[in-house]
Regions:
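Generic low-polarity alpha-helical segments
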Residues: 1-2, 148
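Active-site C-terminal subdomain of aminotransferase-like
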Residues: 2-89, 174, 182
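Conserved C-terminal alpha-helix-loop-beta "cap" of PLP-dependent enzymes
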Residues: 61-72, 76-182
Length: 184
């Protein structure tokens, strides 16, 4: 509890929650530990996601696919685009990412007519938190130029596993010939 002058109580409320919201958001009831842990872990998690994006760009560029940004370009977010030029490539990539998921890895994502899109879309995200963009995920519209958008990985190792599983899925689907990987 905090007791004292109104102005001091208000300052405490802003300090313990957020400026401008203060007491209006109510008690935090034990969630502050999770917030602070998130702040503490954020640099490590973002670093892992960025390393995963660079790894994906490097591999897919070396085997002949167009990637944006490329492996050596300056980065301003965690999203990595890979253009496959075919629906089969987008689908196999997303299915490989889903297979590496910590949640629902047994699910096989399929393209579908999602509201708000002008084409079918496929999404892979076996995440702990639905809609989390920092967790390993991939999605893409099933239309030319057939690009997929990869992001996340709570750890570098998980991002790497996702990319390796995506490669295996592309090989299994006949999109990539295994001999292309010899140069890696």
């Amino acid at each position: 509890y905090v007791a004292g002058k109104k102005e001091l109580i208000e300052n405490c409320a802003y300090r313990l929650t957020s400026p401008g919201l203060g007491k209006e958001v109510g008690a935090s009831l034990g969630v502050m530990q999770s917030f602070y842990q998130g702040f503490f872990m954020a640099p490590t998690v973002v670093c892992g996601a960025l390393k995963g994006a660079v790894f994906a760009a490097n591999i897919y560029e070396k085997i002949g696919y167009s990637v944006v940004p490329n492996a050596s370009e300056s980065r301003h977010d965690i999203i990595q685009a890979v253009t496959f030029g075919s629906a089969d490539g987008v689908i196999a990539f997303c299915q490989g990412i889903q297979a590496a998921a910590p949640v629902d890895s047994y699910v096989t994502p399929e393209p579908w007519a999602m509201p708000g899109y002008d084409s079918e879309v496929i999404m892979a995200a076996g995440a702990f938190v639905q809609g989390s963009s920092i967790e390993l995920s991939a999605d893409g519209p099933i239309k030319p130029p057939y690009a997929v958008y990869f992001q996340g990985g709570l750890t570098w190792q998980h991002a790497k596993l996702g990319i390796l599983k995506s490669l295996q899925s592309l090989i299994d689907a006949g999109v990539i010939d295994r001999s292309k990987l010899q140069s890696l």
